[in-house]
Amino acid sequence: MECDVINRILNEEDLFDCIKRKSKLTYEVNVGNVIIGGNNPIVVQSMALGGSGDANKDAHEVLELAKAGSELVRVAVNSEQAIKNIPYIRDVLVDNGFDHKMIIGCGQYEIARLVKEYPECASALGKIRINPGNIGFGNKRDKNFEDVIEFAIKYDIPIRIGVNWGSLDKYLASKLMNDNALLSNPKPDYIVLQKALVISAVTSAKRAEEIGLSKNKIVISCKTSKIQDLIPVYTVLSNVCNYPLHLGLTEAGSGIKGVVGSVAGISYLLLNGIGDTIRVSLTQQPGESRTTEVKLCQEILQSIGLKNFNAQVTSCPGCNRTNPKYFHQLVKDVNDYIADRMPVWRNTNPGAKDMVVAVMGCIVNGPGESKHANLGISLPGYGERPVAAVYQDGEKLCTLEGKNIFEQFVSIIENYVSVNYQ
């Protein structure tokens, strides 16, 4: 029996083939210099808080997100002042070296009127997001949708059709619920609503094409607040259409809850080959920067091996085999040092984003983990000789001792970066 199990492990390669790389290519949608879909890297998006009424303040909030690594930044276009600010925000981005088309206008029921009344301002947008559930009500719904699509066609602007669980088309949801109630074996309400999300998105996209918008100008999202709804909805979307998919939980929440929910849902979909662009929609903690959601997107992509942004520090939790106070401080210091240096290395040594540095607490896993990293340091455990072994590319490089181990180790890191990532 044991031999059969081992033979299966050794010979059945499909057992380990549980992560799906993207096999179905979606249409490529150009948003300025950023390409969403196809075989291109996953695009990181964010949304500015905005709404201050101060164009300069709003522009610098967008700029902060761009500097943090957001490739596209969404702003709410919900008033005359908001849309009038768009050209100024664009100019601030351009003056700081960013693409002139990285701003996404997020419109709800007022977007049709605003793009019609202020076309010179709206044309500065790189993409427009519209919500089929509230772009208009009654007999205005279809007309408003058509007006925005025609504007997008005229100014060559891509559209994201963003369907949300909390603002789902009431007419469509009601019809599907009523039809379901007449069945001899009705489906649960949540399944009917999942179907309504997908139908709303796909039929809206097809309607946009009928009006004249090219299929490579359309991105789709169907956001829910629960992972167990998000996954089936996007799985079906991926099966029934070729539009690029924008992933994210809506109303994810704040703190650990929002982080865990977003990471769980987005990571699952990406590891199953679904998704072209992502946003983590966190409720900010008081005083927290909006750039947190950008960093989380980057960490998701880096953690699952899709895209590197920063040198990675691997470390154990520490235990009573080592001096936890000293070890935890060393891990923090190395992390802080690399975070401070990455903005410089991106310009002078861009390959440093692929570097892995291991900081380990003792001999149990320290040498092994350090050998798997580009650079690694393994501290001595209690009762061991007070020296720290350093490994480089799998080989022992030297041992460090004394009170300035951190300074010695970062000197080794700097030398490695300058030699290997020129």
UniProtKB/Swiss-Prot annotation:
Its cofactor is [4Fe-4S] cluster. InterPro entries: Dihydropteroate_synth-like_sf, IspG_bac, IspG_bac-typ, NO2/SO3_Rdtase_4Fe4S_sf. Binds 1 [4Fe-4S] cluster. One of its GO terms (biological process) is terpenoid biosynthetic process. Pathway: Isoprenoid biosynthesis; isopentenyl diphosphate biosynthesis via DXP pathway; isopentenyl diphosphate from 1-deoxy-D-xylulose 5-phosphate: step 5/6. It catalyses: (2E)-4-hydroxy-3-methylbut-2-enyl diphosphate + oxidized [flavodoxin] + H2O + 2 H(+) = 2-C-methyl-D-erythritol 2,4-cyclic diphosphate + reduced [flavodoxin]. It comes from the Bacteria. The keyword 4Fe-4S applies. One of its GO terms (molecular function) is iron ion binding. Keywords: 4Fe-4S, Iron, Iron-sulfur, Isoprene biosynthesis, Metal-binding, Oxidoreductase. [4Fe-4S] cluster binds at residues 316, 319, 362, 369. Its EC number is 1.17.7.3. Belongs to the IspG family. Converts 2C-methyl-D-erythritol 2,4-cyclodiphosphate (ME-2,4cPP) into 1-hydroxy-2-methyl-2-(E)-butenyl 4-diphosphate. This is 4-hydroxy-3-methylbut-2-en-1-yl diphosphate synthase (flavodoxin). The gene is ispG.
